[in-house]
Regions:
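Transmembrane alpha-helices and adjacent helix-loop boundaries
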Residues: 1-198
Length: 198
């Protein structure tokens, strides 16, 4: 979607823009209802696959936001990097995949981590459809036990642990890339100093 929106082909740009604007301009719950009831009408095989319908809705929603994160990350890369790759004989696609995208990953990693955390938390909306997510299990336990708080605290702890682990994983990769940048910058500086001495 990000590459489609940046494409020089107008129909691809239009399609991606329409998709992204529709997803970003409508509530998540509305989209869940649309996929939950609409997909089985289009694909009868999904009639009993309610969990899959909700999963597809979450993926489609997240794709719009992630594509914008990726697009902004790519556009943040110095245009001179791509121009240098093209001057070295790289094709347009190779310059994008082997020069621009690896640098863009460093720019988008924090925002991408936040988006994955949001996906985990948005799964709680699945309880509206009783698809077996954590919030649904909370409702199942709360009914016969008449304990509204204790199961809710446990569900909250589980969600916190999942998002905390995701946050730490993305933070680890971010720090690793920063160290690699500092190391490469230090090596370039050493090389320049040696050249000056020579």
């Amino acid at each position: 979607l990000a590459l489609m929106k940046m494409s020089k082909i107008p129909p691809l740009r239009w399609l991606s823009t329409i998709y992204i604007e529709i997803i970003r301009g409508t509530p998540m719950l509305l989209q869940l209802y649309f996929f939950y009831f609409g997909l089985p009408m289009l694909i009868p095989a999904l009639t009993k696959q309610k969990f899959l319908c909700i999963a597809i809705a979450l993926i489609c929603n997240s794709a719009a936001y992630v594509s914008e994160v990726i697009r902004s990350g790519i556009q943040a890369v110095d245009p001179g990097q791509k121009e240098a790759a093209l001057s070295l004989g790289f094709s347009e696609s190779k310059a994008m995949w082997f020069v621009v995208v690896p640098q863009a990953v460093k720019n988008i990693l924090p925002a991408l981590g936040n988006e994955f955390i949001m996906i985990v938390k948005d799964t709680s909306l699945g309880s509206t459809f009783f698809i077996g997510d954590l919030m649904t299990q909370y409702l199942v336990v709360k009914g016969p036990t008449y304990l509204p708080i204790e199961p809710l605290v446990i569900v909250g702890i589980i969600y916190f642990l999942m998002t905390f682990i995701l946050s730490k994983v993305f933070g680890h990769f971010e720090r690793k890339m920063q160290r690699a940048d500092r190391h490469s910058g230090y090596e370039r500086k050493r090389k320049q100093q040696r050249e000056v001495q020579i």
